[in-house]
Design a protein with these regions (language model features):
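Conserved catalytic-core segment of NTP-binding enzymes
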Residues: 6-109
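C-terminal lobe/tail of nucleotide-utilizing enzymes
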Residues: 61-165
Length: 165
């Protein structure tokens, strides 16, 4: 990835890793400038976040990547109807402050269905709450990074095809 640092073609390169702390994640952290990590609004997600912070410290201590930092935390699978979701968000914000994005990604049936159709949520249910949240997240990410880029709004398909349940 080193050539990408000097190549002005790309503003950002995202390395999307599986949700494990294995060798793929370690290699991605060795190559990354910062980590943007999704955290589910679930009790055990807090333990996972602690493990991620420790892994970042290990990468820094090993000398594999001295630039690496925890750049942001995105709260996902948020259900506003539950106290648990609200409490997890509050706890993570208390401990990590500004690193936690304001945008939260809601729990959504459509979001769960999209991969089984080989589509992103922006393609599968472009006008639904989850797609709107991901657009808001992209705008917030670019604002935080001072990027002049804009979020490309995908054309909306008829609302009847996009209704989230």
């Amino acid at each position: 990835l080193k050539p990408l640092h000097t190549d002005q073609t790309f503003d950002f390169v995202f390395l999307d890793c599986p949700p494990s702390l294995g060798i793929l994640m370690i290699n991605a952290l060795a190559a990354a400038d910062e980590l943007l990590t999704p955290i589910q609004c679930e009790y055990f997600a807090l333990e996972g976040l602690v493990k991620i912070v420790r892994l970042i410290e290990q990468v820094l201590d090993s000398g594999a990547n001295e630039r690496l930092e925890l750049g942001g935390i995105v709260m996902t699978m948020f259900d506003s109807r539950t106290n648990l979701s609200q409490q997890v968000v509050a706890d993570v914000r208390k401990h990590f402050g500004e690193r936690v994005y304001e945008t939260v990604i809601p729990r959504s049936v459509r979001l769960s269905e999209a991969p089984s159709f080989g589509k992103s949520i922006l393609e599968y249910a472009s006008s639904g709450p989850a797609a709107q949240a991901y657009r808001a997240l992209a705008r917030e990410f670019m604002k935080r990074h001072g990027s002049p880029a804009t979020v490309r709004e995908l054309s909306h398909t008829p609302a009847s095809e996009n209704r989230e349940t």
